[in-house]
From Swiss-Prot:
Pfam families: Glyco_tran_28_C, Glyco_transf_28
Keyword set includes Hydrolase: no
UniProt GO cellular component terms: plasma membrane
UniProt pathway annotation: Cell wall biogenesis; peptidoglycan biosynthesis
Main enzyme class: transferase
Protein name as annotated: UDP-N-acetylglucosamine--N-acetylmuramyl-(pentapeptide) pyrophosphoryl-undecaprenol N-acetylglucosamine transferase
Catalytic activity: di-trans,octa-cis-undecaprenyl diphospho-N-acetyl-alpha-D-muramoyl-L-alanyl-D-glutamyl-meso-2,6-diaminopimeloyl-D-alanyl-D-alanine + UDP-N-acetyl-alpha-D-glucosamine = di-trans,octa-cis-undecaprenyl diphospho-[N-acetyl-alpha-D-glucosaminyl-(1->4)]-N-acetyl-alpha-D-muramoyl-L-alanyl-D-glutamyl-meso-2,6-diaminopimeloyl-D-alanyl-D-alanine + UDP + H(+)
Organism: Mycobacterium leprae (strain TN)
Top-rank taxon, per record: Bacteria
Record function comment: Cell wall formation. Catalyzes the transfer of a GlcNAc subunit on undecaprenyl-pyrophosphoryl-MurNAc-pentapeptide (lipid intermediate I) to form undecaprenyl-pyrophosphoryl-MurNAc-(pentapeptide)GlcNAc (lipid intermediate II).
Length: 407
């Protein structure tokens, strides 16, 4: 196993690392990021980790996760230390399912407290999901027994999940991606996303990006993707519209998913390219090459697409609590995109909408500008600064407690 990943501590009360004399007076700030499970929880945490390190190169960053999540791969790849705890799968609503998991919750909380002690945590930043709940509970103190650790809650979705609804009860700061998350006192900051996206200059990179994918400089490019696994309904609808799109001079860059296949017609000579790939490992180039996007509306997707100023046709995932539609509404209401129900997505609709937008440069330009206005490029920096401010205050308070001989 990667030595930057450590298994659950099972309640071990570990001794903090011995600091040298220079650091004992003013030890490094220690931040724990609780955002495991799906990419929607892990990627914002990693974006904040990068921002923390940019603001304070000496900061100690610990990611909290489980052996079941994507964090076991993504966190070490980004160069950060990962501590594993017992998974606590959560129901999407407050039901009896959670009440039947007291032992698992207790075990995860105990393991998390041990992590906090070992890394001498000054602040916990939670991003929701089944890793965040034990972190929020473990951060609660007991007077004269165990110190309380400040908590920052970040909610990426338009409708908050159960973990974050629990976390806000004792959080010092509550941050959200969009208004109306249901979390009291939430400050809207956007979704933390990777610096390769937030610093992307699409016009400057466009020529190289289009050359990379085989498009001409003056091509009209439609980008299609359904997340890392693709989306079958998007694949069928856009592939079915290929002939009409080609006839209208629209080139397509289509990421159809690693587990999917895509049936395409044989293109006619001279038609715009239809570039189909299982996965795009350079989303910055894909965004720079595109003029319009068809995609799902997960929180990370909406955040990235709007941050780079791309107009989009959002097709919310039809299963769940409707949060994907809500994620897209701020951009759509601002004029930066459209929402199409998954059940309504047909080849005919794709052809009509895409051709209509490409035939109206003024509207496409207005949508581009609107998307850019709504997009947040500084969310990771904002969350990191909030965390460091709280961590610094906690470190100073802890130093005062130690000097006064108080627990």
């Amino acid at each position: 196993m990667n030595n930057s990943v450590r298994e659950p501590t099972r309640g071990r009360r570990g001794s903090p690392p011995v600091a040298d004399a220079a650091l004992s007076v003013n030890p490094p700030l220690s931040v724990v990021l609780a955002g495991g499970g799906t990419a929607g929880h892990v990627e914002p945490a990693m974006a904040v980790a990068d921002a923390l390190r940019a603001l304070d190169p000496q900061v100690r960053i610990t990611a909290l996760g489980t052996s079941r999540g994507l964090e076991t791969r993504l966190v070490p790849e980004r160069g950060y230390h990962l501590e594993l705890i017992t998974p606590v799968p959560l129901p999407r609503k407050l039901t009896g399912d959670l009440a039947r998991l007291p032992l698992r919750v207790w075990r995860a909380v105990r393991e998390t407290r041990a992590v906090f002690e070992v890394v001498e945590a000054h602040v916990v930043v939670g991003f929701g999901g089944y890793v965040a709940l034990p972190a929020y509970l473990a951060a609660r103190g007991i007077p004269r027994v165990r110190r309380r650790i400040p908590v920052v809650v970040h909610e990426a979705n338009a409708r908050a999940g159960i973990a974050n609804r629990v976390g806000v009860r004792t959080a010092e700061r509550v941050l959200s991606a969009v208004p109306g998350s249901g979390l009291r006192g939430a400050e809207v900051v956007g979704v933390p996303i990777h610096a390769t996206i937030t610093t992307l200059n699409r016009p400057a990179l466009r020529a190289d990006a289009r050359k990379h994918f085989g498009f001409t400089d003056d091509a009209r490019v439609l980008l299609v993707f359904g997340g890392s696994q693709g989306a079958v309904s998007l694949n069928r609808a856009v592939a079915g519209a290929a002939e009409d799109l080609a006839a209208s001079g629209v080139a397509v860059l289509h990421a159809y998913g690693l587990k999917n296949t895509l049936e395409l017609r044989t293109p006619e000579y001279g038609e715009p390219p239809y570039v189909a790939v299982p996965y795009l490992d350079r989303m910055d180039l894909a965004y720079a090459a595109a003029d319009l996007v068809i995609c799902r509306s997960g929180a990370m997707t909406v955040a990235e697409v709007s941050a780079v100023g791309l107009p989009a046709i959002y097709v919310p995932f039809p299963i769940g609590n409707g949060e994907q539609r809500l994620n897209a509404l701020p951009v759509v209401n601002a004029g930066g995109g459209l929402v199409v129900a998954d059940a309504d997505l047909t080849p005919g609709l794709v052809a009509r909408q895409v051709v209509r937008l490409f035939s109206d440069p003024a509207q496409l330009a207005a949508m581009t500008a609107a998307a850019a206005r709504v997009g947040h490029r500084d969310a990771a920096h904002h969350v990191a600064k909030v965390a460091l401010d709280l961590a610094r205050a906690e470190r100073d308070t802890a130093s005062g407690r130690s000097a006064g001989g108080k627990p």
